[in-house]
Amino acid sequence: MKKVLKISLIVFFIMTIIVAIIGVIFITNIMNETKNVTFDKNKIISATKQINVYSDNGELVENTSVDGKKIVPLSDLKDDTINCFLSIEDKNFYKHNGVNYKRIAKAMLNNIKSHSFKEGASTISQQLIKNTHLSNEKTLKRKVKEIVLTKKLEKAFTKDEILETYLNVIYFGDGCYGIEEASNHYFNKPAKELNLIESATLAGLIKAPSIYSPTKDYES
């Protein structure tokens, strides 16, 4: 019995070392791949980026590119507009350091309970990184890279700069990228004139723009 226990402990110890080595190599590779990444707000917003939009079942529904857009300063937006996006997308945006680990743990628990991956846990900072620097593949490597780059972003930008950049590049459906273009498209007015209901409508589009679009024909 003691011999079996001893062998089990040795095997466990060896496996732990192997996993640790693999983990170190994995993280080191990601750090090397991201070490030269720098952030420039104007370049992020103005850069042309090919974007694929997928339906809930993973089918490609739109393939388009986002060109340079007029930057809408955060200071031009009403508090109600800003608060709508924070309330829906990231309530603790100004409190966390880019990654909300408590939110991630809660989402993982809920997904396990529901046997699905319906609930996400990405902060606004993570969403910005995912939409401007990474692909849409759902792999551990991409997620870890997202976290690493998010940490770098939080050091390079202020919270207001991150939120401003996010609002100027995020996809709102119907080919609209950025709050100014979405506001003009859906409500025929500049973003600075959005009221509370209009702001809430736009904020609600981000999670599933193809489903919640105000222009969608729900009777068909």
Q: Which ranges hold each PLM region?
A:
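Juxtamembrane regions of bacterial inner-membrane/periplasmic proteins
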Residues: 2-220
